[in-house]
């Protein structure tokens, strides 16, 4: 079954809101073995909406709309659809009663314009809205299916799961099941080179790379009768990829870097403290995103000035004068100092030039040093990052945490 998602709303075209509905629906349809071939966005205009319906029904078996079900004159999704399909809409008493009950529940008066939300063709399958006023509907016509859903994500998701998914299951022949591997420390082009033959030759499962926020993901997708059968197809391909990429694969699914690192620290009862200059607390912030990290995270210090570095974490004045605040020597003393001062097993530090100003020929914008002290073993890493100030700072944090993860694994800590 080929599906198309048609999002309705001028606010989407203007960029006032993000179309998260399409992402959600696409993923859930994939779980049901239904492939989304196209996604479209159209404004609140009857003529253009009709053109969108005409195109969608030409190329898809299932058309799912979101938005445009409100009580105002520019909410046209249903009206144009019914006209296009040659359907006459009549007041659906049960839907009207539910809308009236909704307004009573929130203690607000219902206006006459809300009645149009309860109008549907007699052969429509009504999808009740338990979180708002606008019901949806399913219409079968000429071996095509139209499913009309509300725009607010909270209402759309509930209606999709409660009403549309049970309806669509009767068409389900296969499931599409995916597993995502998350990769750090290797660029997208290098990942593609390492697994090139897998990308080229795999048909079921397929493997597709994506790059975002300093990391690369590989999505392995299999089609089978059941999720269990799909997982069996995915398993050998996943293992081959892991064997080739090694430590670069840090997690799968929606697991974050801070979750991986936080679990390692907590499971092994290893304490940590941070000393930050250019990242200004972002490093500590990423760590404390993980629930339960308080059992091992001792302290986060922002030692931005030289005075703070000397006073709070015992960086030597001679080191700062000889090598400067942005240096491997300073990063090393920051990491070692914060570990000693806080009594932590690990100290991790950042110092650099995030920009846009402050760079020199010898020390350009984007030069960052990261220091790690693990139970007295001190190492530093020099980074050369590109982008604006915020990007340099964010990438520093990711690179620092990823390096710490690898160092812990190399020491036998998992």
UniProtKB/Swiss-Prot annotation:
A Pfam entry, by short name: CinA
Annotated InterPro entries: CinA, CinA-like_C, CinA_C, CinA_KH, Competence-induced_CinA, MoaB/Mog-like_dom_sf, MoaB/Mog_dom
Gene3D superfamilies, alphabetized: 3.30.70.2860, CinA-like, MoaB/Mog-like domain
Domain of life from the UniProt record: Bacteria
NCBIfam families, sorted: cinA_nterm, molyb_syn, PncC_domain, PRK00549.1
Family: Belongs to the CinA family.
Protein name: Putative competence-damage inducible protein
Biological classification of the source: Bacteria, Bacillati, Bacillota, Clostridia, Eubacteriales
